[in-house]
Amino acid sequence: MSELENFHAISLPSRCLPYDGVKPEDITARSYLGRDEIYLAEITPDNLDQKFLQIMKGAIRGIDPEQMTLGDREYFILWEYIRSYSDHLGFELVCLNCGKQIEIQVDLRELNVIELPENFKQPYSIPLPSGIDVQLRLLTIKDEIDANEFAQKSNEALIFRCARSVVEAGSIVDKMERLKSLPASDVATIRAFHEHFYHGPNMNTKFKCPKCGAEDDIEVPFRFEFIFPRGEALTRAFGKRIRP
């Protein structure tokens, strides 16, 4: 292993609570290498799940990337961007106080991280509005890949995702049929479970307008450039290193 392939400890926002037999202290990751850029350049919104999984398999150790939660993946994407490309993100917006177009720089290292509560445990039992209890788990990268493949041939991907998170005996088809017969409020509650236990980078931060000095809150957009910077994002990150 070369010096560039040194693996470093990474603290996942899930605290590894959803993973059986996985210890947080055993999770390590490395920054991207040149060979990773070959595959990163091929990633599009349509193939992100499959392509980025291949990158993760070589860049993270101590866990099977397919079994990682979507929140942990989002955190890992930002972790890699900070270590491999830039710890700052610049973008333009309109100040709501003075109405001027401004450019701000956000230090990505200062973003807060939302973690799963220490008492989180899977499967997680919740009562549905109809009165029945259901056991749920968080969705994984493998679930998302399967859901996207399912969406290519069916318009029931939403129900598919919900069914994958239900922990009970029976096939995925049986679970989907059961969910389709439940009240909409029950299905919405299952969806709310995943929103409630979001974990990953908190993209909300504060900024100060350079024109008028007003402070405001902003949600930093989780952009596709976090996967592979190009164009203006690439120039902002590395353009100053190139002498005229």
Predicted regions: what they are:
Residues M1-P244:
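Long C-terminal interaction/binding lobes of large macromolecular proteins
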